[in-house]
Amino acid sequence: MTRTGLPALALTALACGAPAGDEATRTAAGGAGGAATAPADRVALFGDMHIHTMYSHDAFMGTVRTTPDDAYRFARGEAIPHPSGESIRLSGAPLDFLAVTDHAEYLGALPALIDPDSPTYGHPLTEDLFSGEGGAARARLGALSRLRELAATGDPINGPEVRASAWQRIIEAAERHNDPGRFTALIGYEYTKGVGGRHVHRNVIFRGGEAPELPFSSLDGDPEDLWNWLDGLREAGIEALAMPHNMNQSDGLAFPDRETWKGAEIDAEFAAKRIRNEPVAEISQQKGTSEVHPSLSPNDEWADFQIVQYYLDRVNNTDPISIFKGGYWRDALLTGLEMEERLGVNPYALGAVGSSDSHVSAGSYEEDNRFSSRTNTPQARGSAYREEDGGWENFWTPRTATHGTGGLAGVWADTNTRAAIFDALTRRESFATSGTRIRVRFFGGFGLEDAIAGAADQVAAAYEHGVPMGGDLSASESRTLGAPASSPASGNAAAPSFLVWALRDPENAWLQRAQVVKGWLEDGEAKEQVYDVVCSDGLPDPETHRCDDNGAQVNLDDCSISRDKGAVELRTTWTDPDFDPGARSFYYVRVLENPTCRWSTWDALSLGIEPNPDLHATHQERAWSSPIWYTP
């Protein structure tokens, strides 16, 4: 997210001509206030559910010494120390909620080595990690390999006493900072399963203040074993969910369509277990966006956004990632339709969230205020060449330079509490952003356009006559409602209509367009199409379903942006012109801002040099809704 330097506008001013009591007024309350008395009174909350502190072994090896308490303080707007020695702080508004998600694997093992009260204080591995020689990256990685070997032998370095102590401290920090109605501190952790550098990671989030004595880690079993564990917790009265992330680095292992991790054939039971425990996926974070890949969706002009090209967990491996199918959210949504046709259950009916995956106890969401995980210089992160390079032609761009800023999770919740946020996630009334705070609403229904026309409160009418993002529509509803809308592709068959609504982040760029991304099955084959449904300056072309370029510009001399292009609000009702009542389908909204400078360009500007030619100078920040599904 890039700060434009403009004064923050009251959200009530954003909904041009919006009826009193509707969206604009409703979101002005932010995260404070009492519980919603009706679904239409739900508020948009922004948070991060992927933060690492010193209790994660990789963060600790990166000289991070900040704690969960620091993470919550940062989220609430306070300054905390960065490993570089600098002080870091949000330049915009505080977050509404946060989850510290330290790795369950070797949880707290490294801080315990230098804690005099720990049973592993003075362990032989300590010298390897903290001696002068151990300061080198290779030595630290060697020590990490040794840590894994020791853990496999039952060495107390990864014993239950060490892990339970760290876990308890994480829970206690969440309890200290949880402030219902004002700020929510969720209890969570990361399950970090890797197969040869390929990620099948998950974050686990708990609904309340109850949590098990120890988190379930990848050392305890594969993701299916994790779901069994979550099912067992639920039976014991402890509700939790998992959300996959970094799917873009999984080589297709994130979303298999035929074979489980145990080598068995995927069946309906497996599919049901997965979607029961994993209702949402993290599709935007600093290690890349996992919405879509250009090779999977070549007709999507906006697919090339924060695409990570290299594996992160293979030292000195510069081979690019080459397997994309099974590693991106839209592809999984399409695969889910095919699997539902075959199995009767869709394991990939996934909502969307974003988060940061920060390893310094603080998410970096702002393009002009970005900080790295360890060293915090432009030269180290590839946005500036070193003096000895003499220019870009002699500079090797590190693979991490393609990383972005952190994403954010948005939810429409009854109030700012653990239970309300968790419930929004389970019903998939959630959305993701690339770090900007665009508010997105999305409703679908048969006859919805007529039902909300002229309504005093369109949101209330949309809840009454349709479903919000994350919901399901069926052919039986179409027949019951007798909706009048029709589409050319289906003759007289009723087609669903959708309410698409987005409000600009008042401290970021103006909105350029809102799109509906549709996926469906046609003769058993998955298809997709992107429709521009509302433009900031003009109307979509009815033939191409595209908005004209609105002409918004970025001045690379100072990163200033066009002030006369774009919209503060985008709102429309849209009816699918190509609806086939016999085809399984899904729809989700993607909202694009006008172009702004990427973080690497801001870095170059601060040093008075040209931006790195190997990186995008500008990009379009965005938001994604969770889908609405249609079942024939």
Question: How does the language model describe each region?
Answer:
Residues 1-6:
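Bacterial N-terminal signal peptides that target proteins for export
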Residues 17-20:
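Bacterial signal peptide processing site
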Residues 51-61, 125-128, 144-151, 199-214:
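Enzymes and membrane/adaptor proteins characterized by extended Gly/Ser/Thr/Asp/Glu-rich
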Residues 125-152, 541, 558-559:
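Low-complexity, serine/threonine/proline-enriched polar segments
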Residues 57-62, 150-164, 207-220, 318-327:
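The substrate-binding groove and active-site-proximal loops of carbohydrate-active enzymes
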